[in-house]
Amino acid sequence: MPDTPYSVITISFVCLLFYGISLAFERMGIVTGEWQRKVWNTLLLLSVYVAGSIGLLLAITVNYKINLPVFNKLLVWHVDFGVALVLISIFHFSHHIKYYLRLFRKTGAVSKSNEKHTFGQHSLQTGYRLGFNLKRLPFSLGFTAMATQLILLREFLAVFYGNELSIGIVLANWLLLTGVGAVLNRKTTNQPVMKGILTGLFLLAIVPVVMLFLLYWLRNIVLPVGSLPGIGQIILGTAFLLSPFCLLSGWLFSAVSLYLSNSLKQNAISLTYEWETLGSVVAGILCSLILIFLFEPFQNLAIVLIINSSILFLISRKEIYSVRKKFYLYLVAAVFVGFATLIANLDKNILQFLYPGQKIISFKDTPYGKLVVTEKAGQLNFFDNNTLLFTTNNVIANEETVHYALLQRKITGNVLLVGGSISGVADECLKYPLKRLECVELNPRILLFGRTFNLLPHDPRLKIYFGDARIMVKRKQEEKAKILSRSYSAQKALDPLSYEAIILNIPEPTTLQINRLYTCEFFGMCKTLLVEKGMLSMSLASTTDYMGADALKIQSTMYQTLKTVFQNVVVIPGEKNYFLASDGSLTPAVTMLGADQKIETEYVNEYYLDDASLAERSANIMKRISVQASVNRDLSPVGCYRQLHYWLSYQGNFNFYLLVIPLIILLIIAGIRASGTTVALFSAGLSSFHLKLF
C-alpha cells in the first residue's frame, strides 16, 4: 500500500467548488449552458482516459509481476482520478437527468418553458413601483459587499499577521479583483436578466461562508503551523480566497447598472451608485456597531445571508412566476442555513483548525482583534489575531520583564505597568514593597478572561485601567503640569502622578498603533511622570548571540530613540532584549542587586544567571548598535518600518519591484487606452481613497 494518503476530500471539494462556480456563471448568463457542458464533458473524458490508462498499466504490472518503481505513485493517481471521474459523472448525469426521466414517462411529450425575463416585461407595474423595486438590487449588492468586507477583513487580519501592510494588501486585492469582475461583464455578450442577477446576488451571500471556512482550513495546510506568512504568501493567499466573491461583486455591479439603465430607459449609473452606497452605509452601521459585538463571524455571515435573501424575496415577488417560485426555495434554504449556523457552534469548531494540538477554551472578537485562549498540558495560551501574547506560568519571561528593571532601584513608590496584568508580570511587581501598581490594558476583554481563569492578583495595591496607554500618560502629564504650575507646595497631589518605574510589556512595533508607544515623543511624556533617576523599561525580540542586519537596525533605532530622552541606556539580553533607560545609573549585574534586596525569584538569581556573562553579552550588543540609526518619531515611524522589514526578512528578501513595476505598466497601458471620463473617474477614486488612508 502507498504511504501517500488519497486526496478524496480535497479533490471532492475542488470539484464541487469549481462546478458550483461554473453553474453560477451559467445561471447568471456569463457563459452558456453549452459551454459549461463542453468543459465538464472534456474533463470527464480526460478523467476516464487517465484513470483507465493507469488502471490498465497497473493490471499488467500485477498480472505479469513486473517490478515498477513508481507503482505506489501510480496507484495514488489512479484512485485520485477515479474520485474525480465519479464526481464529474454525477455532474454529467445531472445535466441529462431529464432524458432519463422521460424514459419512465408514459408520453414522450415534454413541456418546456424557456420563459426569460427581459427588459420590457414590467408592463403590469407602474413606473414608480418598478423603479423602487429595481433600486433594491444595488442596495442588496452594496449591503452584502460591505457587510462581507467588514466581517472578512477582521478574519484575514486574524490569520495573516494583522498590521497595516496586511490591511493594504487585502484591500488592494479586493479593489483590483472587483474591478476585474466589472471588466469581465463588458466581455459578456448576453444581456443581463433578472433571474441571473437575483441568482448572482444570492450567491454573493453564500460565497463568504465558503471563503471563511477555506481561510481557516487552508492556513495550516499551505503554511507550517506557527509560521509567519510572507508578503508574497499574503498576496497570493488573499487573492485566491477573495477572487470568487470580488469577481462576482464587480460583475454584478456592472450588470445591475446596465439592467437598470435598460429597464428605466435612462442612464442609471448614478442611481446604481447611490443605492449601492446606501446599502453599504446601512451594512457599515449594522456590522460595526451591533453585529460584531454580539455575534461571531459565521453567525454574522448567516445574518447577512438572511437579510440579503429577504431583500431578494421582496424583489422577486413582483417578478414573473418562474423567478418568484425559485426564490421561495432560495429564501427557505437561506433561512434554514442561517438559523442552523446561528444555533450550531461552527466558529469554535472551524477556529480549531488554526490551533492543532490545543484545546480552545474561550474566544472573542473585540474591537482590537480576535482574542483566543487555548489550553495544552495545563498551560493557558493567549493569542491576539493568531499571534501569541503570553502563556501562563512562564516564569522566565515574567521575572526578566520585571526584575531586570526594578532591581536597579529600591522601589517603594508607584510603578506603572503597560500590559501584563494577568500574564504573571503584575505578580512579580507586587513582590516589591511598592505603594501602588497601576496597570493599563487596552482590551477590557483581557480582564474578563483574567477573572474567568482566576489570573488576577488579589492585592489592594493593584489598580487596573482600561484604555490607550498613550492617552492615559498624556492626561497624567497634563495634570502634573497644572499642579506644578501652582505657587504652593503640591507634593501630596503629585504622588499619584509620579512613578519610580514604567514597564512597557507590549508587543513589538509591528503596527502604527503600537509604534506610538515606542516613539521619542511618548518616551518624553513618560519621563515627565518619572521621579528623579526613575527608569523606563521596554523589550524587543531576542537576538541571542548573533544579530542580523535587519535585527541590528531595529535594535539600534530603539536604542537611539531612548538615548534622545534619557542619559543612560543599557540592553540586557534574555528571552528578549530588555532596554532600560534612566538618568541615573544602570547595570546588567542584576543577580548581585537581587541578593542585596532579598526578592524571592526562581530564575533571576545567582543560581541561574551569571553577572559577568550578562555584562559581556550586553556589551557585545551595545558595541554593535549604530550611533547613526534614525530616531523613531510620531511623524516618522522608523521603528514600525524597521520592524516590518525585520518580519519580511524571515521569508527572504522580497523584491518589491517585481510587484510595483507590472502594476505601473498596467496603469500606463490602461491610461493610454482609457477615455477622458475614465481617467477622471480613476483620478477621483485614487484621491478619495488616499484621503481615507491618511
Give the residues covered by each predicted segment.
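Membrane-embedded alpha-helical bundles that constitute the cytochrome b-like, heme-associated redox core
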Residues: M1-Y128
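Alpha-helical transmembrane segments of multi-pass membrane proteins
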Residues: L124-K480, R486-F694
